[in-house]
């Protein structure tokens, strides 16, 4: 039974003392605060409480002077109970002795400490453990504890508490221990390794806190009195805001604060915007070029880290990153003879130590300028993928492409000016060359020249390029030489993916702006299609785009058979939009697996302005199918043996079969309907209506040479309509007049003769041209007339019906 309900429960003093500990320290603070307030009350109030208290005490004493504590506050100390023998220490009349409180605190009572006090206590514990380990030469413990106090210092500086004195004492303590120990005396390999590690770390930390260490050496006792080390205010007198914006500003050394920010990057508890604000303040007080360079090399990636979890970097932050990269390049351009940043420099141990000068008097700093430009370009592309392409925001955002291209060119020229080793230069220029081609390969020649001119106009005069010279900018072949030169350099790289990408860029540009046959030969000789399925999705999408552009290039020259052959396999796919990278990013995110990262999904789609119009692709393929399949279909139905055409679900033959089954056939509405009506007119030999339907398709306006293409298309429709007419009516006529056919299809007589003779020879049709070349005489062949065909069909159906109505008697 619980003691609360037991009548004979004996109160145990020992349990009472343990139960008294249940009173939390927060309650004591609350009561002590109320005690200080009660002392300021009026005397009348005090007398009132004193009287009531004395009465209650008298009652208790008279009733049960020896009774144990009882009531709802039985577990409290006597001075806190309203009843039960002890007087309240908060009342003036109580005989409370302050020595009781001191004794209670000495008995191990918990005291509420601030986070700063707890951190200082942890540092003090480290100091004590290192002191003990120093006596036994336990360098493993010293190394671990010195590691711990370094992490505690980072926590203190993140909260802008400065550098505690105890930390300086520990550094001095470990430094003295290192100096007093000889490595030869350490026989254990693990201990010797820990000694070397500690020696390097304490050397670095001591140099970072050189001023504080000097003060400690001069006056060690002063560091026992103050809670934190007082660092001298720098000459610049700048202040750094706290991470929360509410703590008091502190003044610290430039590189000490910069090192703290570098150590804080990547931690989940760090406020990225606070780091950016701190770095921006550091830039306002930087004086030397080295300080500016190191601050920008830290600030730029910090801006990208701040938006790492977003779909794309906000435009205002993107422009800030762009400005920072531009300023960094400007500083590097101005100090190119003194400081250079590249990926092949040696790392430095201490950020405040400038690199040593090489034989040319240049201090080389480890860093990747183009990684910033590349990340900026990726964020730009992501923003285009997430903005509505049909809105004005997309066009406004697209204007920044020129700025990105300018940075790419500036970075390329900086590499050419700073890297002397040819091997290093080729490695460094690979990525800028790929990015330049990525921004221009799909554009027309005029647009590329405009971009190049604008980019070169902002380049300082002292920068020259041996790969893409500015001197040839006014020549007519500048763009061709640019694309070919960049592609040739990249095709010599060891990376096979880069080689294939460079070749595909060149083929696409050639097919779009130049000659189809040249682009086709480049594709066949390069063997770029070999194992293309084994490469990443972006390269496969580029290959599919090249194939489509090659087909469109053939169509512009009215090479119908070539165009149909190129596009047939690609358009047989039911996911044309996906294989061309033209689906929306949102749709990819819904269909992708959970393992696919955001970057992988972004590589599977292209911005809207790079898309190839799908309607144009469809109408080109349907038109090619119309000109090839309609004459062959007519010849086949006329009993002529023709070569089978590869099947395609988007062919005009399938559309006609579906159209003939419709119960209602309305006027044309879609582009497929217009091509379908053009096919029906061609079957009748009416080439004028066929051309009229084709010309009403609005997608032709996307072709740069629309009128030239339509004129060539008209001539081809006339020829194919002539073939269709000849196949349809040769079984009804014994001869065809060349003059009549020329008048009917608006073709020269020699053209009519040439077309029909080639058809007769190819398909082995029993017909020939007379000696005067005016009449085609058709011999009677094996084909049957329409009337005979109908009779055969009717006779077959009659036999089937007769057998069904009158089955044989012996049939089981």
From Swiss-Prot:
Which GO terms of type biological process are on file? formation of cytoplasmic translation initiation complex; translational initiation
The further comment given in this record reads:
Present with 78900 molecules/cell in log phase SD medium.
Name the protein family. Belongs to the eIF-3 subunit C family.
What sequence ranges are listed for the domain PCI? 608-783
Residues with the modification Phosphoserine, per the entry, are 98-99, 103
Q: What is the gene called?
A: NIP1
Name this protein carries in UniProt: Eukaryotic translation initiation factor 3 subunit C
What is its biological role? Component of the eukaryotic translation initiation factor 3 (eIF-3) complex, which is involved in protein synthesis of a specialized repertoire of mRNAs and, together with other initiation factors, stimulates binding of mRNA and methionyl-tRNAi to the 40S ribosome. The eIF-3 complex specifically targets and initiates translation of a subset of mRNAs involved in cell proliferation.
User: What residue spans carry the Acidic residues bias annotation?
Assistant: 18-30, 38-64
Reply yes or no: does the keyword Protein biosynthesis apply.
Answer: yes
Primary location group = cytoplasm
| Assembly, per entry | The eukaryotic translation initiation factor 3 (eIF-3) core complex is composed of TIF32, PRT1, NIP1, TIF34 and TIF35. A subcomplex of TIF32, NIP1 and PRT1 mediates the interaction with eIF-1, TIF5/eIF-5 and HCR1. The factors eIF-1, eIF-2, eIF-3, TIF5/eIF-5 and methionyl-tRNAi form a multifactor complex (MFC) that may bind to the 40S ribosome. TIF32, NIP1 and TIF5/eIF-5 comprise a minimal 40S-ribosome-binding unit. NIP1 interacts with TIF5/eIF-5 and SUI1.
Residue segments, region Disordered: 1-110
Q: PANTHER family of this UniProt entry?
A: EUKARYOTIC TRANSLATION INITATION FACTOR 3, SUBUNIT 8 EIF3S8 -RELATED, EUKARYOTIC TRANSLATION INITIATION FACTOR 3 SUBUNIT C-RELATED
Q: Which UniProt keywords apply?
A: Cytoplasm, Initiation factor, Phosphoprotein, Protein biosynthesis
Q: What is the native source organism of this protein?
A: Saccharomyces cerevisiae (strain ATCC 204508 / S288c) (Baker's yeast)
